[in-house]
């Protein structure tokens, strides 16, 4: 079987920067309790590595980040706990609460997420109604919706028919940085047919877009796609969805243990890629495993 290693793959710059910040914090503050508020990025291997550095992840779907901050005790005022907010973004009130409480705060929010937030705030000040295309309950979406209660979330095209908004307000549409280009195009085309006074800004980040484009433009000979990424990783799951949309059998794998032999039956060309939050070493480990398993090594 031929193997094609799709590039780019692996960590994006935002993840590299966030991870480097955590490693620096671990080195500079050895005597402080250190907590990640939410997964730094959606990958279990990274969370394990950070735990080994003394950084504990606090993430609970039943409690908000604000409530998590409330639960952190300051036992030594000379060495207060350090809290690190994830790359997906966190609402400003929660960050302010952490500082007011006396915690040492580090915010690793991705620059692309910050740019989207700044643009939304600017458009709200200009009198626009904001439509936000994103995944409900994803931390990036939660942080964005916290900017203003008037922001309307659109998860699928089916949500559009239920939208109720002030007709005289101009509409500005932007999106979560890790949705697929297909989702953005499908939803925006439907919105164009319903609203006249509407503007769009595609805020899919460059790293996610580059990885999506690479899958979209895979050689036609590919008949099996494997994406190395965590089950919680939205950008990794979108790569799988794009493969399926191209009518290629596609699977998300987070280690070598969930690779199934039946996937390779009657297949001739395997393409491998990974999400923005997948460590390069993990993607390479899976590639080497598959090369040995399939008895081949190709570019």
Swiss-Prot record:
Record Pfam families: LYTB
Keywords in alphabetical order: 4Fe-4S, Iron, Iron-sulfur, Isoprene biosynthesis, Metal-binding, Oxidoreductase
Matching CDD domains: lytB_ispH
Residues given in the record as dimethylallyl diphosphate binding sites: 42, 88, 138, 233, 235, 277
Residues that, per the record, bind [4Fe-4S] cluster: 12, 110, 205
InterPro entries: LytB/IspH
Protein name from the UniProt record: 4-hydroxy-3-methylbut-2-enyl diphosphate reductase
NCBIfam families assigned to the protein according to its UniProt record, in alphabetical order: ispH_lytB
GO annotation terms (biological process): dimethylallyl diphosphate biosynthetic process; isopentenyl diphosphate biosynthetic process, methylerythritol 4-phosphate pathway; terpenoid biosynthetic process
Domain of life: Bacteria
Organism: Malacoplasma penetrans (strain HF-2)
Binding site for (2E)-4-hydroxy-3-methylbut-2-enyl diphosphate: 42, 88, 138, 177, 233, 235, 277
Function: Catalyzes the conversion of 1-hydroxy-2-methyl-2-(E)-butenyl 4-diphosphate (HMBPP) into a mixture of isopentenyl diphosphate (IPP) and dimethylallyl diphosphate (DMAPP). Acts in the terminal step of the DOXP/MEP pathway for isoprenoid precursor biosynthesis.
Cofactor: record remark: Binds 1 [4Fe-4S] cluster per subunit.
Cofactor: [4Fe-4S] cluster
Family: Belongs to the IspH family.
């Amino acid at each position: 079987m031929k193997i094609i290693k799709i590039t780019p793959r692996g960590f994006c710059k935002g993840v590299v920067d966030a991870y480097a910040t955590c490693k620096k914090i671990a080195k500079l503050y050895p005597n402080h309790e250190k907590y990640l508020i939410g997964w730094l990025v959606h990958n279990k291997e990274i969370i394990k590595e950070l735990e080994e550095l003394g950084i504990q992840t606090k993430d609970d779907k039943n409690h908000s980040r604000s409530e998590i901050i409330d639960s952190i005790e300051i036992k030594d005022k000379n060495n207060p706990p350090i809290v690190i907010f994830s790359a997906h973004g966190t609402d400003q009130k929660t960050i302010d609460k952490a500082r007011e409480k006396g915690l040492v705060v580090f915010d690793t929010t991705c620059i692309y997420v910050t740019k989207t937030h700044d643009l939304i705030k600017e458009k709200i000040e200009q009198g626009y109604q904001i439509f936000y295309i994103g995944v409900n309950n994803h931390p990036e979406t939660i942080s964005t919706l916290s900017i203003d209660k008037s922001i309307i979330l659109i998860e699928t095209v089916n949500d559009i028919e239920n939208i109720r908004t002030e007709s005289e307000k101009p509409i500005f549409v932007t999106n979560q940085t890790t949705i697929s280009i297909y989702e953005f195009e499908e939803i925006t085309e439907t919105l164009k047919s319903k609203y006249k006074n509407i503007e769009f800004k595609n805020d899919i980040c460059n790293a996610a877009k580059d990885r999506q484009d690479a899958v979209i433009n895979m050689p036609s000979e590919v008949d099996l796609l494997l994406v190395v990424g965590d089950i919680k990783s939205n950008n990794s799951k979108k790569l799988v969805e794009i493969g399926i949309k191209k009518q290629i059998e596609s699977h998300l794998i987070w280690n070598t243990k969930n690779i199934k032999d039946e996937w390779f039956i009657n297949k001739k060309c395997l393409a491998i890629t990974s999400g923005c939050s997948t460590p390069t070493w993990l993607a390479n480990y899976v590639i080497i495993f598959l090369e040995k398993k399939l008895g081949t090594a190709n570019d």
